[in-house]
Amino acid sequence: MPLSYQHFRRLLLLDDEAGPLEEELPRLADEGLNRRVAEDLNLGNLNVSIPWTHKVGNFTGFYSSTVPVFNPHWETPSFPNIHLHQDIIKKCEQFVGPLTVNEKRRLQLIMPARFYPKVTKYLPLDKGIKPYYPEHLVNHYFQTRHYLHTLWKAGILYKRETTHSASFCGSPYSWEQDLQHGAESIHQQSSGILSRPPVGSSLQSKHRKSRLGLQSQQGHLARRQQGWSWSIRAGTHPTARRPFGVEPSGSGHTTHRASKSASCLYQSPDRKATYPSVSTFERHSSSGRAVELHNFPPNSARSQSERPIFPCWWLQFRNSKPCSDYCLSLIVNLLEDWGPCDEYGEHHIRIPRTPARVTGGVFLVDKNPHNTAESRLVVDFSQFSRGNYRVSWPKFAVPNLQSLTNLLSSNLSWLSLDVSAGFYHLPLHPAAMPHLLVGSSGVSRYVARLSSNSRNNNNQYGTMQNLHDSCSRQLYVSLMLLYQNFGWKLHLYSHPIVLGFRKIPMGVGLSPFLLAQFTSAICSVVRRAFPHCLAFSYMDDVVLGAKSVQHLESLFTAVTNFLLSLGIHLNPNKTKRWGYSLHFMGYVIGCYGSLPQEHIIQKIKECFRKVPVNRPIDWKVCQRIVGLLGFAAPFTQCGYPALMPLYACIQFKQAFTFSPTYKAFLCKQYLNLYPVARQRPGLCQVFADATPTGWGLGMGHQRMRGTFSAPLPIHTAELLAACFARSRSGANILGTDNSVVLSRKYTSFPWLLGCAANWILRGTSFVYVPSALNPADDPSRGRLGLSRPLLCLPFRPTTGRTSLYADSPSVPSHLPDRVHFASPLHVAWRPP
């Protein structure tokens, strides 16, 4: 007969009708009983022949991939002009006085941040924008390209101009070595930037002065026209200098970009004055030390003999006859002036050698499940987290639930601040740019994917043998719709581009660490400036607490002004005032303790409504179920031990079948949630100890002892002794010398015992007492006559490593690999 829910509940001692604890509880450690219960609940039948269920509610497992949804009307979010002040340490010291060593160290980490992976793998530009939406390839291309352009204009990305130079918008930092600011700075840096002339090329040095003179005379116009070149050679100057060295086409460092001035062959008359008709010719040195731009008259023998000029793919359609009703020339002829082929930033800097490649792909998704109108850029830099050369990201303190409750459970009024684009506040050193490259190969290659009869014969430059091979109805309709949104920018976005991150990207494991260090240091400064208030952060989520609403408002004003003075951008529309119940990290934290937020409780209820009974569920689905239930497990009677059968099926990669009793048990557990309370400081006066054959308690002057009917593993015996001490004394602070009991993780014990002990010891705090000083040591060995001196050990609630102050442990030195010993604990859950 299957085990009923009521019988199972009585077995776990969850009802008041249970017998004496000293008799009932040791039975739950019996392996035979645990095996019989597992068989009755059908928990151990891992090998089933019935087909697995691969979907439960919104949880999907194997063979049921969710198709991403593309929104053609996504709005690209706007980014403010984010510029974190370089003298942030000085500004903080003006605000609060001298900084602590830890605050200063954390702020120095991000001024600027550095990223040097062991190995960087470069991918072709074709893989710059991932074909995440095969049905919307062109639309997704232009939307992503527009997002990248927005980031560049906001100063978040560098734009690669040549192998050794990049341009960007916004305010420069001191470590961004300026490349061009008029003739003077070019002359100062010319010795280090221009290529070393070969023997006998005195003509180059002879003409250097005239080039500089030309630059200074033409001023801004010349700098803009030739802004991405390092040496500027006027088209009228004859030259006898041979090329310094053409980089081999197979080396992977050739720039695939349509030249800017080539576009002027198809520009309107008024634009010809602005963009003179001079063909450009780009060369890379094989040594990587020099990149020069040489200008020659369009018909010169030199320019034709070296390399054919590839004009702008987009503007070529202007002078071609329409091939059909859906020819792209019809779109190109809609506008007389399509603007330049390229744009340049306000500043040009020198960068390490950067190939015309990408190191990660990008694609767009919804900003979040609640905001599908705006898009979010996903950057895949997972190459740095995989393989033999993966980077070990630094670890940082994250508060667990009990630490968070100890810190924030109070009678304060709360509000939370929203930091706009938190990651994009932290600047990266330009030396990291070659490792964090994104970009695109130009729309012509994407067009080639759509067209079945297209022939992409010239792989090196991405141009087509026949221009009109790319024309199709699908492409025409897509571009006409995009023209409504982007207008002349369609031309700009159709060109290849390589961009590197100037601020830390979200797709690298280093970024969360740096953001956590930054916000924790800022909150530490705020706490010291306002000692009667509380400021706390996790990543970009910052909360402020004060004793009254009026006090909180004045604190909010002062802190907001301070953060704005540092260059930190806040979103005032998303500032939330919580009253006395703070919503933070998925919890509701009040003076009573912590509980899960309401939307998580609703998800759990929905999950139990959808979970089928007596049907094997794919272990991938079980992973997702356990992820949801595990978040709320500390608020239930039996906690994590109740989920151990599910953990076992995931570990063995087998299906799991919910029996009616086990489902009812879990359902009741999660329908009645108990808050996790704040730990209070106090004195420990109740002690427990055990041997494999007996247990002993010390409660003030009173001593108690007992024996087990059969010898038990020492950790199990110690856990039983702690349960007896809690049950008999009612004390919520216990002293023990067992590290496993101290850890309060009961998933390593026999399943039934772990569930029962979690409920008995819920809300109990433990203090470590050495065996030599433990008053319960003698009773556990059967000696009641001896009396040790009375102990009163102080208990102080822990906040983990997340201290309210910036005094964190110093950076540890590199230790050798830790030796792993076999654990003496029993395996938590073994299927019968």
From Swiss-Prot:
Which residue stretches belong to region Disordered? Answer: 186-218, 239-266
Which residue intervals make up region (Polymerase/reverse transcriptase domain (RT))? 336-679
Could you tell me one molecular function GO term of this UniProt entry?
Answer: DNA-directed DNA polymerase activity
Q: Where do the segments described as Terminal protein domain (TP) lie?
A: 1-177
Alphabetical GO biological process terms:
DNA replication; symbiont-mediated suppression of host innate immune response
Domain Reverse transcriptase intervals:
346-589
Is Transferase among the key words of this record? yes
Keywords from the named record: DNA replication, DNA-binding, DNA-directed DNA polymerase, Endonuclease, Host-virus interaction, Hydrolase, Inhibition of host innate immune response by virus, Inhibition of host RLR pathway by virus, Magnesium, Metal-binding, Multifunctional enzyme, Nuclease, Nucleotidyltransferase, RNA-directed DNA polymerase, Transferase, Viral immunoevasion
Entry's EC annotation: 2.7.7.7, 2.7.7.49, 3.1.26.4
Which segments carry the region annotation Spacer? 178-335
Q: Which residues does the record give as Mg(2+) binding sites? A: D418, D540, D541
At the top level of its lineage, which domain of life is listed?
Viruses
Q: Does the keyword Manganese apply?
A: no
Q: Site: Priming of reverse-transcription by covalently linking the first nucleotide of the (-)DNA. Where? A: Y63
Q: How is its activity regulated?
A: Activated by host HSP70 and HSP40 in vitro to be able to bind the epsilon loop of the pgRNA. Because deletion of the RNase H region renders the protein partly chaperone-independent, the chaperones may be needed indirectly to relieve occlusion of the RNA-binding site by this domain. Inhibited by several reverse-transcriptase inhibitors: Lamivudine, Adefovir and Entecavir.
Domain remark in the UniProt entry: Terminal protein domain (TP) is hepadnavirus-specific. Spacer domain is highly variable and separates the TP and RT domains. Polymerase/reverse-transcriptase domain (RT) and ribonuclease H domain (RH) are similar to retrovirus reverse transcriptase/RNase H. The polymerase/reverse transcriptase (RT) and ribonuclease H (RH) domains are structured in five subdomains: finger, palm, thumb, connection and RNase H. Within the palm subdomain, the 'primer grip' region is thought to be involved in the positioning of the primer terminus for accommodating the incoming nucleotide. The RH domain stabilizes the association of RT with primer-template.
Q: Give additional notes from the record.
A: Hepadnaviral virions contain probably just one P protein molecule per particle.
Q: What does this protein do?
A: Multifunctional enzyme that converts the viral RNA genome into dsDNA in viral cytoplasmic capsids. This enzyme displays a DNA polymerase activity that can copy either DNA or RNA templates, and a ribonuclease H (RNase H) activity that cleaves the RNA strand of RNA-DNA heteroduplexes in a partially processive 3'- to 5'-endonucleasic mode. Neo-synthesized pregenomic RNA (pgRNA) are encapsidated together with the P protein, and reverse-transcribed inside the nucleocapsid.
What the record says about family reads: Belongs to the hepadnaviridae P protein family.
Provide the protein name: Protein P
Q: Which organism is it from?
A: Hepatitis B virus genotype D subtype ayw (isolate Italy/CI/1992) (HBV-D)
